[in-house]
Amino acid sequence: MVIHGGIDGYSRTVVFLRCSDNNHASTVLSPFTDAVQNHGLPERICSDLGGENVDTWRYMVEQHASTSAVVTGSSTHNEWIERLWRDVFRCVGVLYHDTFRKLEEDNCLDPLNETDMYCLHFVFIPRINSTHLKVLLIHGTTMLCLVRTT
């Protein structure tokens, strides 16, 4: 499972977070364009050099007719998104990581079995998106740890 996210660089507002079962460029573009509909088109975006961002870069260049609409580089230079990832892992990722690890230890989940992985994604991706990540989007990172269940 992969979580993609975006933050408004000015207000530091989380504009999208979505869990999915792949890291394809079209998968990243979908929540980005949803965020554009809700928050407007940004002047520019900053992203790392990952191939999963290619469609989003292309979209921005087409919308602005300029390559200056995309700034790429190391994500370590973007402290706000790094802080978000730390909080997401600390308060959401750890919960599911521990759950999935326990399922493996109890021989209820084989990560090499396609059926097991399909079922895991079918059950957990909607739950992660509709509860944990949705609450974070509504309330921001200050509410994140209130979402955590142990």
Regions found by a protein language model. Name each.
Residues 1-137, 144-149:
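RNase H-like DDE/DDD metal-dependent nuclease/strand-transfer catalytic core used by mobile genetic elements
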